[in-house]
Amino acid sequence: MVQTDISQLSGECTTWRTNLRNYREEFTQDKIKLQQAVGHTLPKDKFQDVEHLQNQFHIQLINIHDLKQAIKAHDRKVNLEMESNNGQLHDETLTEHENLFDQYQALESTLQELRSEFNGFLERTQ
């Protein structure tokens, strides 16, 4: 077991969840913008791009939800362990925290790529 600053771990979890919530709101709005773009006359070759973006928004919104829930459960686990183990965490819990951070960074990179791809699509269709 390792003595750890719970406020730092909880703070990181809160930050990750807040950022994921912001991405969720952004991509929900982007789905609406995409539907509005489809309402305009688009060349047939753009419909494949629309379908790709719709699929990506759907998949990434699911990924955001799943990771947010995993972080929330981890944060609860950290708090429970700290209370029941006199302020100490199991090594596995710290490893889980690091793994969640890696997952968060990977998802954030994917989300930024999707944001860039979508903005490029909007520029090409307007």
Name each model-derived stretch:
Residues 1-126:
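Charge-rich amphipathic alpha-helical interaction elements
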